[in-house]
Regions:
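Conserved catalytic/ligand-binding micro-motifs in nucleotide and anionic cofactor chemistry
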Residues: 1-78
Length: 78
């Protein structure tokens, strides 16, 4: 499965959002302002908000967002 960190737009200028994909499944999301805040798994864990229920609509939206290049995909930090 894919283990990735997806980087996207934040809620306001200067902020970015992230999605954590583990084994091909969306497990959490969060927001950050500075790149160093997402450089380690430990730091990500402090910012992440767990996703409990991923509906088919969310999966579809994520696929569409990928097609539109709305996310930058990085390797998930260890």
């Amino acid at each position: 499965g894919r283990n990735e960190l997806w980087i996207g737009k934040g809620r306001y200028l200067g902020e970015k959002s992230f999605l954590i994909i583990e084994e091909g499944k969306l497990i959490s999301f969060g927001y950050y302002e500075l790149f160093h805040q997402i450089q380690s798994r430990e730091k990500l864990n402090k910012l992440q908000i767990e996703v409990k229920n991923v509906s088919p609509e969310i999966i579809n939206d994520l696929k569409l967002s990928l097609l539109k290049n709305e996310y930058k995909i990085e390797k998930l930090p260890k």
